[in-house]
């Protein structure tokens, strides 16, 4: 996998990306938390085949995606081989090592297995290396059907280490218009040719809503990016292969698909969004 120097077009939901050496192929759009089970169906119909579910923290907030996956698979067992389901645990060792991902399997009829094991909220060496070891052993043993492992990073230096040493099949990082520090201490250190993808989370955390914009008393002629423009901001970076997103309702899936068709932002638009977010979320997070 070679990252382009400049992105000419944004990824589409129907595209597929290989997860490391797992043999699994995922859409660049990964669906996470949602209020409506119908959102899962709409995402699948739009080409999304990658889903993100929690195994512990925020369990009630993922009820919509669990029910949506159950509905997607009900009466259509062949669909199970078309989708990739990742389950994240935010527990540290020794609890993490128990790998209680089977609870999600039991909660979603037809799920049968967890394709991707994810260590959540990696913030230190202690929360990373022991969990990587546990996941690698589980992957080697095919525990709960696992074929791939990944992590969500709060400490970017560890994301660099994991990429340079091919420790994971996927990594999730945090980059947005109020949190642009990855430009300085992460993206320059990623190899141009990678064996595993980089996905982003918290892409819209930096949104300046119309109400926030109005309170700034800026000229009416200034651009007010909509929520999907924040995904465009993230995916404009060629180092990022996909995004974890949380559309609450089916129509938001279509809105995202249409937004991605607009293509990448210009450099001026990127800088404008960073500036605008800094006015509301000041000081700008690095």
Go through each PLM region and give its residues.
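Beta/alpha (TIM)-barrel catalytic core signal, keyed to glycine-rich beta->alpha loops juxtaposed to Asp/Glu
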Residues: 5-13, 33, 120-286
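Structural motif corresponding to the early beta-alpha repeats
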Residues: 74-96, 120-121
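Active-site mouth loops of central-metabolism enzymes
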Residues: 26-38, 86-97, 214-224
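A structural motif
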Residues: 48, 111-114, 168, 240
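Active-site groove signature of glycoside hydrolases
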Residues: 105-127
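N-terminal binding-site loop/beta-alpha segment at the start of enzyme catalytic domains
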Residues: 1-83
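Acidic-and-aromatic substrate-binding clefts and catalytic sites of carbohydrate-active enzymes
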Residues: 33-38, 53-65, 90-97, 123-128, ...
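Short, charged beta->alpha transition segments
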Residues: 69-73, 98-108, 158
């Amino acid at each position: 996998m070679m990252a382009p120097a400049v992105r000419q077009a944004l990824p589409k939901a129907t595209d597929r990306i290989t997860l490391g050496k797992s043999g699994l192929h995922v859409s660049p759009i990964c669906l996470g938390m949602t209020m409506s089970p119908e959102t899962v169906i709409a995402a699948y119909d739009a080409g999304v085949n990658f889903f993100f579910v929690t195994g512990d923290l925020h369990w009630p907030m993922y009820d919509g995606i669990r029910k949506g996956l159950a509905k997607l698979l009900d009466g259509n067992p062949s669909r199970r081989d078309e989708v990739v389901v990742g389950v994240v645990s935010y527990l540290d060792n020794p609890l993490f090592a128990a790998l209680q991902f089977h609870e999600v399997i039991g909660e979603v009829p037809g799920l049968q297995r967890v394709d991707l094991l994810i260590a959540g909220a990696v913030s230190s060496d202690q929360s990373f290396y022991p969990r990587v070891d546990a996941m690698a052993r589980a992957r080697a043993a095919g525990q709960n059907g696992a074929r791939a492992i990944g992590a969500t990073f709060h400490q970017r230096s560890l994301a660099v280490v994991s990429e340079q040493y091919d420790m994971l099949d996927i990594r999730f990082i945090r980059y947005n218009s109020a949190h642009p520090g990855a430009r300085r201490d992460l993206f320059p250190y990623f190899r141009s040719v990678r064996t595993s993808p980089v996905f982003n989370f918290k892409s819209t955390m930096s949104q300046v809503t119309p109400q926030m914009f109005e309170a700034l008393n800026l000229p009416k002629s200034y651009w007010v990016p909509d929520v999907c423009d924040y995904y465009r901001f993230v995916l404009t970076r060629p180092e990022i292969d996909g995004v974890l997103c949380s559309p609450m309702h089916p129509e938001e899936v279509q809105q995202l698909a249409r937004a991605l068709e607009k293509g990448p932002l210009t450099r001026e638009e990127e800088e404008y969004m960073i500036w605008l977010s800094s006015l509301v979320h000041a000081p700008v997070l690095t």
